[in-house]
């Protein structure tokens, strides 16, 4: 039987939900009105908290304990956001803007535009 998010992450689940809300609220504040061409730079935004099965699989591959506390301590992607943009330039502009926000810290980024995954 699969664990629920609450069972796996325990009390940290509610903190993860709050982090997810902060990220989404911040993204909604992106100054899109500054775009003279009128094209909305963010087509849509999707967020998630990594599901327990995926997190356990990731931790097993790393050879560490598979509990929720270890997951939060040892990984950087318990909470994730995907922003789909109208144009490639918008991706870099939004990424740069996010890095200037002071209500969270970006721990790691991966540039799959410049360096696509091999699959």
Role assignments for model-derived ranges:
Residues 1-75:
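Charge-rich, low-complexity segments
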Residues 63, 80, 117-119:
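Glycine-centered flexibility motif
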Residues 72, 85-119:
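Long beta-strand-rich cores associated with HINT superfamily self-processing modules
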Residues 79-85:
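Short cationic amphipathic helices and targeting signals
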């Amino acid at each position: 039987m699969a664990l629920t998010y609450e069972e796996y992450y325990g009390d940290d689940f509610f903190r993860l939900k709050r982090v997810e809300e902060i990220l989404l609220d911040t993204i909604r504040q992106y100054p899109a009105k500054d775009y003279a061409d009128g094209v909305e730079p963010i087509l849509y935004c999707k967020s998630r908290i990594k599901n327990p099965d995926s997190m356990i699989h990731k931790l097993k591959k790393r050879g560490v304990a598979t509990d929720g506390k270890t997951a939060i301590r040892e990984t950087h992607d318990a909470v994730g956001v995907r922003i789909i943009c109208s144009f490639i330039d918008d991706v870099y502009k939004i990424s740069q803007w996010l890095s200037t926000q002071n209500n969270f810290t970006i721990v790691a980024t991966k540039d799959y535009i410049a360096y696509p995954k091999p699959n």
